[in-house]
Amino acid sequence: METEPVSVQKVPAPPGSPCRQQDSALTPTPTMPPPEEPSEDYEHSQSPAEQAIQEEFQFLRCPSCQAQAKCPKLLPCLHTLCSGCLEAPGLQCPICKAPGQADANGEALDNVFFESLQRRLAVFRQIVDAQAACTRCKGLADFWCFECEQLICSKCFEAHQWYLKHEARPLADLRDNSVSSFLDSTRKSNIFCSNTNHRNPALTDIYCRGCAKPLCCTCALLDRNHSHLHCDIGEEIQQWHEELGTMTQTLEEQGRTFDSAHAQMCSAIGQLDHARADIEKQIRARVRQVVDYVQAQERELLEAVNDRYQRDYQEIAGQLSCLEAVLQRIRTSGALVKRMKLYASDQEVLDMHSFLRKALCSLRQEEPQNQKVQLLTRGFEEFKLCLQDFISCITQRINAAVASPEAASNQPEAASTHPVTTSTPEDLEQPKEVQSVQAQALELSKTQPVAMVKTVPGAHPVPVYAFSMQGPTYREEASQTVGSMKRKCSHEDCSRKIIKMESTEENEDRLATSSPEQSWPSTFKATSPPHLDGTSNPESTVPEKKILLPNNNHVTSDTGETEERVVVISSSEDSDTENLSSHELDDSSSESSSLQLEGPNSLKALDESLAEPHLEDRTLVFFDLKIDNETQKISQLAAVNRESKFRVLIQPEAFSVYSKAVSLEAGLRHFLSFLTTMHRPILACSRLWGPGLPIFFQTLSDINKLWEFQDTISGFLAVLPLIRERIPGASSFKLGNLAKTYLARNMSERSALASVLAMRDLCCLLEISPGLPLAQHIYSFSSLQCFASLQPLIQASVLPQSEARLLALHNVSFVELLNAYRTNRQEGLKKYVHYLSLQTTPLSSSASTQVAQFLQALSTHMEGLLEGHAPAGAEGKAESKGCLA
């Protein structure tokens, strides 16, 4: 006769209590022992239902060893591992490599939720298999007691109900239910008072927020200090569920940010792979053109490229692994909270809530470290330059080896007749057809007037006089064929330089009517060479915007001269009127001249067979700006190419009545529009590594035009280092002195337009044109932006300007330094030391001390920034200058 299940519930007596001792048949047994690992034969013989259960609860397995987690431990990263995989407390998680900082005792939290779920699943498997044994007599079980959590046969069930009267159900009914129904029915909602002094555990539904413990009615009445903090424990648990759910929703939004950063990292790796493949293809293509002599060099170049790739890949891969670890923690936390909401009991939520909340709060503080980091995916340009020099050296040796003895014997005679054609290494690089064309052009020059050049020992040749080359004879017959070729004459080998020119009656009239104070032209304009980007269209000039200024003594040039675009900007801020003289408000006398000088070569690629097309197609735009010393804001901005000029002049308020006043933002927009008329030009500046460009970048950023400016240009060209290479013997490399010496021009140091015109004319005179030889002097926008971001360290005297430049050349920004220090305050900044100048030679003991002092100063400054106040500038100045000056 079957006994109906009794619905009356009774609190289970603790082991050893008198109630338990009354029932001799009810011996103390453990409640639901942990299940054993199923054998391989059992796994192969699983039913479809069992396989579905195993797939649904796969998360109960240890993610490290994929075995049934015994004594599961919950780590702060919210990964659950078995006790076997958790080798020692405080170690890193083997899944996400997160540091194992657990609770105050240094141990991971027992995952009571997983352990309870494993036990209940094991019981359900026994019930479904119809092989459940009675936990008392080991006979075939027929009932399941939800209070004792034991399997009971019919005989033991009668005694069990006689003494305990617990709720029990036949196993036949449970077999028809699903695993979810069984797990839901076994979720206990009975919570007992946390006071251990009770003789019998007392059920309670009161929770004290002050004690953070459940209390019975008696204990709640005695706890008068926290009477206002008592609440219903069910409502409190529900509030905890909602709080954890809200935190997981916030983490999901944060996860999308990490997904975006992860995608950028993967894209960067793809770009890095593409860059490596591209440079390897170029290297192999050029090396295949030579014989076995160059194979050893090929291997060296490929190894260097691979080393650079591995270094850059490791940097990106390290950040990628950190992002993947945080993403995995976010997904794990969300899954754990959802599963606890589905399957965890209230007691389990009470036990684990504080730990979960602390872990989720720590996870919410994570931020992607790559949001403002510029990725290094174009770091192979230096290998292209090495390859170019290598090929040039080989070509020179091959041409020298095949030269005939007759040519070698005739060379001195030719040099005495035509000094310009003295054989140089550059001449050996040119094909015979090019050299023949140059010889024809030189013969043609015999019929043209020439300008002699005086030679000073140790200095660059200085022109004595010059005429404009206006006649069609030379321009059509020689300039079009030889204009794009490079012809150099070393001033150690020749005593003079021949410049082929033609003097016309019009030029003589201009010379007669020119100012007596000026004995030669102050500037020149090349009329024959085409545009810097390779196009030649003299009629496609930019329309002029004329704005009349007071006291304008500018002498307009002839109608054939290109017009200029001038935008005058009025500023509401006060400035010193003495800084704006009358000759600064006009176009300056150096801009227009009745005498024009034209060199024999245009600003095109010097060696078309070796220069890269994408560099040749770029337009050189000479660019300069002036910063007001008092306001530290832009006072002038000027740019010029071969066809048009652009100037922004910021005047004080007193001059606004004479000009068409526009805002600074409008003026910068006009400047961007001027740049967009060309295809990604190269901005040529006299000084890149100064305070001017950072202020310019900040101004563009204030009007949200910085990224548009980045997309408009292709890079920055340092002009003065190029001039230093061409004329190493010059007495001074200041732009004003160079203009006075080689252009016979008195340049105004306070005029931005005069500076850019001087740079343009110097580059034209020295035959500086776009092409591969300029690549080593062209810097990317990202490098200059990184240098701008390092300005706070320079201003705080923590980082010298020269060392900031070295960091910027490796695309190391201030944000990257700060994040590296925040991540690892002991070792985070050391990896950047090898970029600095001290690493060019082996470190001595004194140099090591200087490096340590520099790192200490930089760390002190970073610590001050993280704490909300920067350290004293004198402290950083003393340490950094002693290290890197």
UniProtKB/Swiss-Prot annotation:
There is a cross-link at K70, K165, K500 (Glycyl lysine isopeptide (Lys-Gly) (interchain with G-Cter in SUMO)). PANTHER family: BONUS, ISOFORM C-RELATED, PROTEIN PML. It is found in: Nucleus; Nucleus, Nucleoplasm; Cytoplasm; Nucleus, PML body. A zinc finger (RING-type) spans 62-97. Key component of PML bodies. PML bodies are formed by the interaction of PML homodimers (via SUMO-binding motif) with sumoylated PML, leading to the assembly of higher oligomers. Several types of PML bodies have been observed. PML bodies can form hollow spheres that can sequester target proteins inside. Interacts (via SUMO-binding motif) with sumoylated proteins. Interacts (via C-terminus) with p53/TP53. Recruits p53/TP53 and CHEK2 into PML bodies, which promotes p53/TP53 phosphorylation at 'Ser-20' and prevents its proteasomal degradation. One of its GO terms (biological process) is negative regulation of DNA-templated transcription. There is a cross-link at K384, K486 (Glycyl lysine isopeptide (Lys-Gly) (interchain with G-Cter in ubiquitin)). This is Protein PML. Residues 566-572 are annotated as: Sumo interaction motif (SIM).
